[in-house]
Regions:
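Short, small/polar-rich motifs associated with maturation and membrane association
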Residues: 2-369, 381-383, 387-389, 402, ...
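Active-site-proximal flexible loops/turns
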Residues: 44, 197, 267, 394, ...
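Contiguous N-terminal and early-domain "leader" segments and peripheral loops that mark the onset or edge
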Residues: 121, 154-209, 290-351, 355, ...
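Short helix/loop capping segments that flank catalytic or ligand/cofactor-binding pockets
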Residues: 178, 197, 234, 267-269, ...
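Conserved small-residue
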Residues: 258-312, 514, 716, 723-728, ...
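Extracellular/periplasmic, surface-exposed regions of secreted and cell-surface proteins
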Residues: 330, 365, 371-380, 385-390, ...
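Long, charge-rich C-terminal accessory regions
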Residues: 504-505
């Protein structure tokens, strides 16, 4: 009986299934077709998938496919590098043409602690097309980014050998700089966060900027720039934005050796046109005769007499033209890469060399990089990478205004053409007709400085090690998508500088008046007796310059070395998984980093005349000067991120980071930096695609978040002490105030502030991305606003001497920055192989000061609430020129002028500029009186 019932049930189910077959057949259609590219070549391996299901197939070698699809279902056809297309059943098309994705929306973009599809980005993140920088011969990677990404400014670089460019992202939000480094962004290379503020002597350097500039372009895989609240994932150090760099790894295939070599020429585009010798003499004569301050000299007596002017017509000592040369730049890279199913590898070495345009300037650098990624098992991966660089820069020791060689161009440019370099054996000190007017160049001779054996050498060495271990839970159906990763990074950076300077002899004319006595060569056909009686004498200040101030020394040798030792550890749990139309991702990471820097400096002065430049072979006549400093800091951070996407249309991201900094007191160690962003891909909406056909892609973005800064030196919350040799007590019986030797005493370095804490920077951003004309023309528009609050600033006000220390930094500054960015890009191709791109980047930015350390006795130049950081240029307001004495009389009468630039009316001459009487003297309440008839540079300047 039991078996009969089972038999009846089975027959009933079979009949029901047979009866349902026509219905199933009626609701399911077979979709057949072929997928081609724009040249109608088959696309092999294109994915055909029923949206919201796991049902799908791929095209064969001829681009053909077959798929059963129920009525009303959508099918998406996609392939990497092409724009996906969707169709709804029933289907009428059998030939599907996929267009190339010029916008690369499926491209994976590196973001903080991971990657995302470009189409899923919700923040203001710019990517740099690295192919555009591969063939640029430059010693500074930053200089190659100029114009390639919106919202970044690139300044400097490549004008001199070894000079790095600097990058700023958007409008900076700083009221007080710390050595100039904290205006720069944070640099993250292969996951390692480089220190931004490492003290070298009395200045700060950004190790990340140096590491970025030293990268060989041939090893760079991607560059991403975080400009808005998306940078909050890096917390405390990301207030000025973040630049993320990923270097290349080996790709599946046989070993591949590649060579890339570039040669470049560095030369001037234009040069200011200077007066020739004759014009120079005529100008100085005119200036002399119009100078109202030369009351003791007959104004009709010219500086250069007519016979001198005639001779100067044939004098043309253009030293800049003599020494300027086109400079060669070259870069060579050799890379080896490859991969198997079990491992990938990449190794490379490169050499860069750059000569200078003036004299003995040169810079060269070696780079190396080697890394391997190993698949230990199906679910375990490991990687290790070693990289570094060694650079050397040589410059002459310029002794004009300091030891820097930066003034050589301006000095040669303004060199009067009538003055030669040498007269016989005498090296001439180049300067103009009067000492006071050209005191900054009166002891300069380019040839002597290039060949006297003095030098300034800088050597840098950087080594980095990155290692990681990853475990994938893909074997577990419940934990699929979860990965655990541990990374360790270490960098050692060394900077050495050697300076060697000796005295040198320059000469100039003993007398400076009379016919023929302004020239260094006899005048042909004239009475040269005055010249023959003129003697040369030694310029007594032709001596080395130390620490930007002239010292009465005969020479010096200095050495300095900075070593920075840093490490970073991360433990990260990352999860990414799709559930139908839902895509979920997230990560949690613990990060610890420490930095230790040591600086050593030594200098000895007044060696005997001959030396090999080695300190142990020189007998010194002075006590060596030495300095040693050591700094350390550490950070502990917790990072979290959550991403959600529905049907690639609705995008949401939450970020949070909690940082600790030992720069603050223990109760203020921690800062919390969250952010949220959202995006809506409007062009994915069915109603949009049916009604708006001229827009191919449209996405709206919005973000808001908090970042911070620890803008101070370490241990300011603890009382620290220094020593002072000159202000200690004096013991003895003498009644003189400074008799005897002062005892060395301890002093407070600064008052403490345990309440000092993180700066806060709230960042808001609205973005719009849209493409038209078959995705060939794209626009990206961003508007941003940043509220900088509780900024840690110093007080300029003096404190009572009884305090015994300078005032501490306090969190009170407020500054707003804002701007708009627009990027327009046209991408197209001619024929099958020729592709081109035209890109325009533009924008506007500004700032507004709300609270800062206002001047206690403000002047009209003082900052006021609502002012910009950049106050522009101040100067006198010119309203004309005195062309006659009648003009002078009318001006003095009309405006009741009693004093004009320190002169009475009788001393004012035609040819002088007319300045406006803007205001009077400053009043007791801080305001200024109206025009008072006194025109002076102190009270009458305006913002030009």
């Amino acid at each position: 009986m039991k078996h009969k019932n089972i038999y009846r049930i089975s027959i009933s189910l079979l009949l029901a299934f047979v009866m349902a077959l026509p219905t199933i057949a009626q609701n399911t259609k077979t979709f057949k077709g072929v997928v081609l590219d724009e040249t109608e070549q088959p696309i092999i391996g294109a994915a055909i998938k029923v949206v919201g299901t796991t049902v799908g197939t791929i095209t064969d070698l001829d681009g053909n496919f077959t798929l059963n699809v129920a009525d009303g279902k959508e099918v998406e056809i996609s392939y990497i590098g092409y724009v996906p297309q969707r169709f709804s059943a029933p289907f009428k098309l059998t030939k599907i043409i996929l267009k190339e994705d010029t916008q690369q929306l499926d491209e994976v973009v590196v973001v903080g602690y991971g990657t995302q599809k470009k189409a899923h980005l919700t923040g203001a993140i710019a990517t740099v097309p690295v192919d555009d920088i591969q063939d640029i011969s430059s010693g500074s990677l930053a200089s190659t980014l100029s114009g390639l990404a919106n919202g970044i400014s690139v300044n400097g670089g490549d004008t001199r050998p070894g000079q790095n460019a600097t990058i700023t992202i958007r409008q900076n939000g700083e009221l007080e700089e710390m050595g100039g480094t904290n205006l720069q962004p944070l640099y993250v290379i292969d996951g390692y966060i480089y220190p931004t503020e490492v003290k070298v002597g009395s200045t700060y350097t950004n190790l990340g900027a140096e590491a970025f500039n030293n990268l060989d372009p041939s090893v760079v895989e991607s560059i991403s720039i975080l400009k808005d609240a998306s940078a909050a994932v890096y917390g405390a150090r990301a207030a000025n934005g973040v630049i993320l760099v990923t270097t290349k790894k080996g790709k599946l295939g046989a070993p591949k050796i590649s060579y890339n070599g570039t040669f470049g020429i560095t030369d001037e585009v234009s040069r200011p046109k200077m007066l020739n010798a004759y014009e120079y003499g005529k100008l100085w004569n005119a200036v002399r005769m119009a100078d109202p301050t030369e009351t003791s000299i007959d104004p009709l007596r010219a500086i250069f007499q007519q016979d001198e002017l005639n001779a100067m017509k044939s004098l043309h000592y253009d030293l800049l033209d003599k020494y300027w040369e086109s400079a060669l730049t070259q870069q060579h890279s050799v890379n080896l890469s490859g991969a198997t199913e079990k491992a990938s590898y990449f190794a490379g070495i490169s050499y860069f060399d750059q000569d200078g345009n003036l004299g003995k300037l040169d810079y060269n650098r070696w780079n190396y990089r080697a890394g391997v990624d190993v698949k230990i098992s199906k679910w375990i991966k490991a990687n290790v990478q070693v990289s570094g660089d060694y650079g050397k820069k040589n410059t002459p020791l310029n002794q004009v205004g300091g030891s820097s060689a930066e003034k050589d161009y301006n000095t040669l440019l303004t060199h009067p053409y009538y003055i030669p370099e040498y007269v016989g054996e005498y090296a001439v000190a180049a300067y103009g007709p009067t000492n006071s007017s050209v005191s900054n160049i009166q002891n300069y001779n380019f040839n002597v400085l290039q060949n006297n054996g003095d030098y300034k050498r800088n050597m840098t060495s950087n080594m980095n090690i990155n290692a990681g271990l990853e475990y994938d839970f893909g074997w577990n159906k419940w934990l699929k998508g979860l990965k655990l990763k541990f990374t360790y990074s270490k960098s050692v950076n060394t900077n050495k500088t050697n300076d060697y300077g000796t005295s040198y002899n320059l000469y100039y004319l003993e007398t400076r008046s009379g016919s023929g006595e302004h020239l260094y060569t006899p005048i042909e056909g004239a009475d040269n007796s005055a010249f023959e009686n003129t003697s040369f004498y030694l310029a007594n200040s032709g001596k080395p310059v130390v620490n930007s101030s002239t010292s009465d020394i005969t020479g010096y040798l200095s050495r300095s070395m900075t070593r920075s030792d840093n490490y970073q550890m991360n433990f990260t749990a990352a999860y990414n998984r799709d559930f139908g139309l839902h895509s979920v991702g997230g990560l949690f990471s613990i990060e610890k980093s420490e930095s230790e820097t040591e600086y050593l400096y030594g200098m000895v002065t007044n060696p005997y005349e001959f030396t090999t430049g080695q300190s142990n072979s020189v007998d010194w006549n002075s006590t060596p000067s030495t300095e040693f400093t050591r700094f350390e800091s550490g950070n502990l951070s917790y990072i979290g991120r959550l991403n959600y996407s529905y049907d690639n249309k609705y995008l949401l991201e939450f970020l949070l980071r909690s940082d600790s900094s030992t720069k603050f007191a223990p109760e203020n160690y921690w800062g919390f930096f969250p952010s949220v962003s959202a995006g809506w891909v409007v062009s994915q909406e069915e109603w949009f695609t049916k009604n708006v056909t001229w827009i191919d892609y449209l996405k709206l973005r919005a973000s808001f978040g908090l970042t911070g800064r620890d803008n101070t030196t370490a241990w300011q919350w603890l009382q620290t002490y220094g020593t002072d040799k000159d202000k200690g007590p004096v013991f003895g019986t003498s009644t003189e105030a400074n008799a005897g030797s002062h005892l060395t005493m301890n002093k407070n370095n600064a008052a403490i502030n345990r309440d000092a804490h993180w700066d806060k920077s709230y960042k808001g951003n609205l973005g719009l991305d849209f493409n038209v004309l078959d995705n060939r023309l794209s626009f990206n528009i961003d508007a941003y606003y940043e509220w900088n609050r509780e900024m840690l600033l110093s007080y300029n006000a003096s404190v009572p001497s009884t305090v015994g220390a300078n005032s501490a930094k306090v969190n009170y500054g407020e500054l707003n920055t804002y701007g708009v960015e627009l990027s327009a890009t046209w991408r197209d191709k001619i024929g099958k192989d020729f592709k081109y791109k035209i890109q325009l980047n533009t924008g506007y930015s500004d700032n507004e000061i709300l609270v800062r350390d206002w001047d206690q006795k403000p002047t009209y130049k003082s900052y006021k609430k609502g002012d910009r950081l950049d106050q522009g240029i101040w100067g006198m307001q010119c309203i004309g020129m005195f062309r006659s004495y009648q003009d002078i009389d009318e001006y003095f009468a009309k405006y009741n002028i009693t004093s004009y630039m320190g002169n009475v009316k009788e001393d004012v001459k035609p040819g002088m500029l007319i300045y406006k009487d803007v205001r009077g003297a400053r009043q007791d309440d801080g305001t200024y009186a109206g025009p008072d008839g006194v025109v002076s540079s102190e009270d009458d300047q305006v913002r030009l």
